[in-house]
Amino acid sequence: MNEKRMPLSAIETPAVIVNMDVLESNIAEMSRLAREAGVRLRPHTKIHECPDIAKLQIAGGACGIEVGAIERALCMAEAGIDDILIAHPFYGDHKLAILRRLLDKPGLKITVMADMIEQAEEISRVGQALGRAIPMLLKVNTGGDRFGVRPGEPAVRMAKRLCRLPGIAFQGIYVHESGGNPTPEGMDRLALEAATMAVQTARLLSKEGVPGAHVSVGASPTLRATCALLKGKRFPEITEIHPGHCTIGDMWHVRALANAREACAAAVLCTVMSAADPRHVVIDAGYKTFGADSLIQYQDMPGFFWQGKPSFGSVQGREDLWPGRISAETACVQYMEPDPAPAKRLRIGDRLEIVPNNATLTISMQEKIYGVRRGGVERIFTVAGRKDRTPAV
């Protein structure tokens, strides 16, 4: 252990800490699953938005990374990441100006996404102006009902239109499954349905002579189910998977079966500011730190409410505490026992580590997060997505 490292006690609260042992274990597990399934791993980085964590993922076996918004691609590219897929279709002059900046970077492979011809036509004009063909995937909606064209014939028709555009190099299709019943059987079913629709569409494309061998599926809740299908060689057309949240984990994905509780790497480090009320303590972190996601979609699950309130996270090592009342800059952590023993009572100045409900929200509100190991700070990660990336148009 490096004795010169900052001790955990020196971190000003509230702050987000990441357990490096757990983070590294999660990265290794994702890579192992993809490798055994015989597909490339391209993790989505929205949960951490940290180039240095992305580099750990690439060093661990990922072929590149995925971002949601094109602005995040710029942050990652400027930090030296050289293979980036932009998972969300985009449109408008502001976004195209960022695309041009990305395409100006030597050695950078950028792949874009479309689900409407209008998006693709704008990107086509950029490609023509630069004298190059921009790699593009077609987003296919297999049930998430956000972005995407319908699988099968609608996707084939759109793919043919994309192939006819100059300045575009059509690569294949992209599927992101979401929803499903949060049970092992529900995740198995969701993975099977998404993979089936993706592969049926890919086979139709091949039959129609449409080039595009890239078939990408996946999500954190279905990671293991998808890899089990692929390991069984049922869907050889699938070439890539793109889970993201299970890199870090949170209580959302514990409920969604993407992570075990012990695989949650991130926590909010906070300090008890008041213990005046015997029923609870007040901490120095509120929804400006945690975000305001109560995970109400899981309200029918056992243990979701306590005394009529959902929680905003889970206290590490203290199942007898309920973080259930939250305001802007403070929150109340309640004792679940009516009269806890003195040894169980928190005192002013005590510190808690609380796994947030939605780590994506929590981390997105930080400028930095602390990588910790054995009671000390091993490294500090910059959350690059926080930076202003408005280009000159």
Per-range role (PLM):
Residues M1-V18:
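Generic N-terminal amphipathic, Lys/Arg-enriched alpha-helix
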Residues N2-E3, V22-I53, E66:
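N-terminal glycine-rich anion-binding loops that anchor highly charged ligand groups
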Residues L23, K46, M76, L138, ...:
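Conserved, mostly hydrophobic/aromatic
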Residues H44-P182:
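Active-site-proximal beta-alpha core segment in soluble small-molecule metabolic enzymes
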Residues P135, T142-A258:
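Active-site loop/helix belt of alpha/beta enzymes
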Residues L223-G308:
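Active-site loop ensemble at the mouth of alpha/beta enzyme cores that anchors a bound cofactor
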Residues R279, I283-V393:
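C-terminal accessory subdomain/extension
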